[in-house]
Amino acid sequence: MENQKQYPMTQEGFEKLERELEELKTVKRPEVVEKIKVARSFGDLSENSEYDAAKDEQGFIEQDIQRIEHMLRNALIIEDTGDNNVVKIGKTVTFVELPGDEEESYQIVGSAESDAFNGKISNESPMAKALIGKGLDDEVRVPLPNGGEMNVKIVNIQ
């Protein structure tokens, strides 16, 4: 049997995916079925753009359902051990870019729940990879997309 990729995530991320799946199954799926039904009532399906659009939407919804079900089946829930000495998935890390004193904070989460606009970065991102395993007051070199790097100092882990 082939090893399935595991999806590390927080309990909060797991529950969010469960809610998203429920919405897809109980709201979005029935809505698109109704759209298909209405579009069929227009007659000839060969040139029925409403029907084609609804079928496309149905395909996307079914893909999303399968993707989320797969991630939930293979989820690896990251438990908070209470250890705030080392950066790991689930922890919120505060650091300052050196030289400087302006603080930035990010929670490191699994890729399935990353949302940079809300301060959640994927454990697979260059920033998270550089920070994971490091400790309080450590100075860390973080690779940048342009090939450069920035130096940061970890000032808080929670």
Curated annotation (Swiss-Prot):
Signal sequence, start to end: none
Gene3D superfamilies reported for this sequence: Transcription elongation factor, GreA/GreB, C-terminal domain, Transcription elongation factor, GreA/GreB, N-terminal domain
Keyword field: Coiled coil, DNA-binding, Transcription, Transcription regulation
UniProt cross-references to InterPro entries, sorted A to Z: GreA/GreB_C_sf, TF_GreA/GreB_CS, Tscrpt_elong_fac_GreA, Tscrpt_elong_fac_GreA/B, Tscrpt_elong_fac_GreA/B_C, Tscrpt_elong_fac_GreA/B_fam, Tscrpt_elong_fac_GreA/B_N, Tscrpt_elong_fac_GreA/B_N_sf
Superkingdom classification of source: Bacteria
Single GO term (MF): RNA polymerase binding
GO terms (BP aspect): DNA-templated transcription elongation; regulation of DNA-templated transcription elongation
Segments forming a coiled coil: 4-70
Pfam families listed in its UniProt record: GreA_GreB, GreA_GreB_N
Family per record: Belongs to the GreA/GreB family.
Function (record text): Necessary for efficient RNA polymerase transcription elongation past template-encoded arresting sites. The arresting sites in DNA have the property of trapping a certain fraction of elongating RNA polymerases that pass through, resulting in locked ternary complexes. Cleavage of the nascent transcript by cleavage factors such as GreA or GreB allows the resumption of elongation from the new 3'terminus. GreA releases sequences of 2 to 3 nucleotides.
PANTHER family for the chain: TRANSCRIPTION ELONGATION FACTOR GREA
Name of the protein in its database record: Transcription elongation factor GreA
Gene this protein is translated from: greA
